[in-house]
Amino acid sequence: MSIVLSEHVRQQAARRGISEAIVWAVAEAPEQVVQVRDGREVRQSRVPFPPDGMMYLVRVFVDVSSDLETVVTIYRTSRIEKYWGIA
C-alpha cells in the first residue's frame, strides 16, 4: 500500500519541529502499531531529537480505510510511558 502525507500533516510537522524524514520513517517502519478504531491506527516510535538527544515518542495517525494509507496527524511527546505498549 502507498502512504501519503496530507498537507495538514506537513504543516503540523514543520510547526512541531519534526522532519518529514522522521514522519516517513515512523509511518513506514514503526516500533509499535496501535489500532485506535476501525480504519485508524497509530504508528509510533521512540526518536531522539537534537540538540540534546532527548527521547520523544513520535505518534503518526494513519487512516487505513482505503487503498491509500493517509497520514492525518502527527505529534511528539515526552510522555513515552503513557502511550508505549498500550493495546
Predicted segments with their positions:
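Ribonuclease/tRNase effector modules and their secretory precursors
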Residues: 1-87
